């Protein structure tokens, strides 16, 4: 509908409106790591009605980063991918500099590992990092992690250009 017909906006509104306006194919899109009270039941109903996959943080914690990464890769396939990374995906213990800190997020390691496992080799056409609020973090650990996240995305683009399409895990399984 038109902007005047839309309900009061919340954090998920731009994504929903992009689907309503035909800018995003919900069947090839996925949202991961949501937690807290920022989304309404209507938002989840809308997502389910339109085939938009979403994985709540609690489900990610239970299934693990690798399984979550596999679902992301399966969902987007070889299609062009625009990645929006919201820093409040990360637990405020590791990234307190955000306007909406909610406990129960992910560690710095889990965050970087998800980025590497899920996005290596994808047809990424754009990336943005949102919700970093330096004034809420005098320790600057949020900015340190945010800069590392941007570094990882740039490295993934370079790897893709070099023909590297799989994340080379160097540890023991």
Where are these regions (language model features)?
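Short aromatic-enriched loop/helix-cap "lid" or pocket-rim segments at secondary-structure transitions
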Residues: 5, 43, 95
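A structural signal for isolated positions on well-ordered beta-strands in alpha/beta enzyme cores
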Residues: 28-30, 128
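Catalytic cores of soluble, metal-dependent hydrolases
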Residues: 46-173
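Short, contiguous, pocket-lining structural segments
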Residues: 6-10, 35, 82, 142
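A general structural motif
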Residues: 10-16, 33-39, 61-67, 107
């Amino acid at each position: 509908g038109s902007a005047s017909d839309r309900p009061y906006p919340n954090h998920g509104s731009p994504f929903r409106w992009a689907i309503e306006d035909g800018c995003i194919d919900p069947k090839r899109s996925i949202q991961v790591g949501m937690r807290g009270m920022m989304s309404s039941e209507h938002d989840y109903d809308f997502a389910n009605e339109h085939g938009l996959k979403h994985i709540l943080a609690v489900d990610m914690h239970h299934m693990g980063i690798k399984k979550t990464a596999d679902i992301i890769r399966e969902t987007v396939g070889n299609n062009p991918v625009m990645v929006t990374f919201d820093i409040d995906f990360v637990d405020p213990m590791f990234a307190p500099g955000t306007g909406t800190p909610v406990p129960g997020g992910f560690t710095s390691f889990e965050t970087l590992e998800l980025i590497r496992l899920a996005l290596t080799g994808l047809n990424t056409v754009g990336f943005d990092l949102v919700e970093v609020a330096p004034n809420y973090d005098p320790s600057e650990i949020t900015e340190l992690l945010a800069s590392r996240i941007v570094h990882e995305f740039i490295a993934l683009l370079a790897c893709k250009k070099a023909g590297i399409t799989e994340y080379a895990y160097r540890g023991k399984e």
